[in-house]
C-alpha cells in the first residue's frame, strides 16, 4: 500500500543530519517547502554555532487575515545518525538497530509538512503559517539561542518535539550549570603533609553539606562530575567539579545555586595553613552558566486550549504536561514566543530502538491539521 506520509518520513530519516551537519536536510526542506508555496530563508546562526547551515524559516501566506501561527521542529539528530536504514515491523518504523532512527525530530517535520499539504489539497482557508526548523538543538539548543528573531513574525505556535500524541508540554525548568574549581596546595604526603592543603578533602566536605537530588517538587540539584589528584603520595592541589540545578521557579533556581556557591566558599575558609610566617588559603573558583530559562505557559492560554480542543475533535485524549528537561521552546519563551511542545509519537528516542508507529504518524498529522483549522476559524 502506498502511503505518502510514511514514504516522506522514511525519505527524511535517510538524510544524514547529525548536529552541525544539517545542510543536506536543510536543502531538502527548502526545496519541499518552496514547492508548497512557502517563502524560505535561512539565518546565519551557523556562523556562531560552527555548523554548515543556519536555521530555516518558511512563510506560508495565509488565506485568511490573521497573525501567523508558528510550527517548529529541529533539523538535527543525535549520534549515531549516519546511513540510517529504516525498517517497518508490525506497523512500526525502526532503524536496522545500528543507528538511531531520527524520529526525533523528523516525525515532527514530516507531520507538519503533510498536514499543510493536506490542507492545501482540501483548499482549506488557513491562517498564515511560519515553519521554523532549527539547527543543533541536540547539542545545547544552539540554533534557537543564535536565531535571528527579527525573521519571525509569529508570537505563538507549537514545537513538535515530544512523545505522546495529544500531550502538550507547557512548563519546563530553567537550568544552571555550575563549574567549581577547588584549589589547595600541593605537598608530599609522606615527607611533609602539614605543608599541603588537600583539595579533595575540601571538596568532599563541601559536597557532604549540600542537599542534592530532589530539593522540592519544582527543583533538583546534582553534582555530576568530579576530577582531581595526581598520585597517591601527593596532596592534591586541584579538584574540578561540575553539576547543575534545575527549577520551574527562577527564584528557587537562584536560591539553590547560591547555596552551593556559599557552601564551597565557607568550607574553603576553614582550609588554611601557616608556613614559614606566610598564610596559605584554599580557594574556590565558581562559574555559573544559565543554560536555558524556564518556560511557564498557563494552561488557560488560547494556544494551549486550541491544541487540547483539536485533540478532542479527533478523539485523542488531550493532556497538559510538565517537563523536567529543556528544549528550543524554553529559548523561544524567553524571547516572548509561546510554543507548547506537542507529542509526535516518537518513542525510545536517542537509542538504537527508537521507533514510531504508522498510526501515530497519521494521528500526529491529523492533530496538526485540526489545530490549524481551529486557529484559522477563531
Ligand atoms: Zn528533539
PLM regions and their residue ranges:
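Glycine/charged-rich beta-loop-alpha catalytic/anionic-binding loops adjacent to active sites
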Residues: 88-100, 183-187, 314, 346-349
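Acidic/histidine-rich catalytic neighborhood of metal-dependent amide-processing enzymes
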Residues: 99-173, 215, 232-233, 241-244, ...
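Active-site metal-coordination/substrate-binding segment of hydrolases
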Residues: 26, 51-52, 59, 65-128, ...
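Acidic, glycine-rich active-site loops and adjacent beta-strand->loop/helix elements
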Residues: 46, 75-77, 132-140, 162-164, ...
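Acidic-glycine-rich active-site phosphate/pyrophosphate-binding loop
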Residues: 78-91, 169-181, 309, 340
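N-terminal capping segment at the start of a domain
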Residues: 1-23, 290, 349-351
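A non-catalytic alpha/beta surface segment that caps or lines the substrate-entry region
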Residues: 18-65
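Metal-dependent amide/peptide-bond hydrolase catalytic core
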Residues: 199-378
Amino acid at each position: 500500500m502506498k502511503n505518502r506520509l510514511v514514504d516522506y518520513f522514511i525519505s527524511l530519516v535517510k538524510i544524514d543530519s547529525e548536529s552541525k551537519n544539517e545542510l543536506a536536510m536543510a536543502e531538502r526542506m527548502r526545496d519541499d517547502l518552496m514547492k508548497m508555496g512557502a517563502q524560505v530563508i535561512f539565518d546565519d546562526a551557523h556562523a556562531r554555532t560552527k555548523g554548515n547551515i543556519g536555521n530555516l524559516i518558511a512563510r506560508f501566506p495565509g488565506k485568511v487575515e490573521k497573525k501567523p501561527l508558528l510550527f517548529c521542529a529541529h533539523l538535527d539528530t543525535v549520534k549515531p545518525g549516519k546511513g540510517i536504514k529504516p525498517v517497518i515491523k508490525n506497523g512500526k518504523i525502526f532503524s536496522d538497530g545500528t543507528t538511531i532512527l531520527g524520529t526525533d525530530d523528523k516525525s515532527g517535520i514530516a507531520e507538519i509538512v503533510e498536514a499543510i499539504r493536506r490542507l492545501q489539497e482540501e483548499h482549506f482557508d488557513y491562517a498564515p503559517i511560519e515553519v521554523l526548523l532549527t539547527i543543533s538543538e541536540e547539542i545545547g539548543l544552539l540554533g534557537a539561542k543564535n536565531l535571528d528573531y527579527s525573521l519571525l513574525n509569529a508570537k505563538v505556535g507549537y514545537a513538535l518535539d515530544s512523545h505522546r500524541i495529544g500531550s502538550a508540554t507547557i512548563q519546563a525548568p530553567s537550568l544552571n550549570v555550575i563549574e567549581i574549581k577547588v584549589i589547595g596546595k600541593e605537598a608530599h604526603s609522606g615527607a611533609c603533609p602539614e605543608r599541603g592543603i588537600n583539595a579533595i578533602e575540601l571538596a568532599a566536605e563541601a559536597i557532604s553539606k549540600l542537599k542534592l537530588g530532589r530539593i522540592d517538587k519544582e527543583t533538583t540539584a546534582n553534582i555530576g562530575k568530579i576530577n582531581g589528584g595526581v598520585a597517591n603520595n601527593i596532596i592534591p592541589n586541584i579538584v574540578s567539579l561540575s553539576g547543575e540545578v534545575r527549577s520551574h521557579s527562577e527564584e528557587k533556581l537562584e536560591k539553590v545555586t547560591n547555596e552551593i556557591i556559599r557552601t564551597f566558599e565557607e568550607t574553603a575558609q576553614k582550609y588554611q595553613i601557616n608556613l614559614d610566617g606566610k598564610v596559605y588559603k584554599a580557594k574556590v573558583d565558581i562559574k555559573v552558566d544559565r543554560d536555558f530559562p524556564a518556560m511557564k505557559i498557563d494552561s488557560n492560554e488560547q494556544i494551549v486550549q486550541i491544541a487540547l480542543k483539536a485533540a478532542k475533535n479527533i478523539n485523542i485524549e488531550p493532556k497538559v504536561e510538565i517537563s523536567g528537561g529543556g528544549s528550543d521552546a524554553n529559548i523561544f519563551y524567553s524571547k516572548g514566543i509561546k510554543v507548547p511542545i506537542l507529542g509526535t509519537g516518537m518513542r525510545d528516542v536517542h537509542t538504537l530502538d527508537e521507533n514510531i508507529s504508522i498510526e501515530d504518524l497519521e494521528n500526529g498529522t491529523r492533530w496538526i491539521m485540526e489545530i490549524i483549522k481551529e486557529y484559522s476559524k477563531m
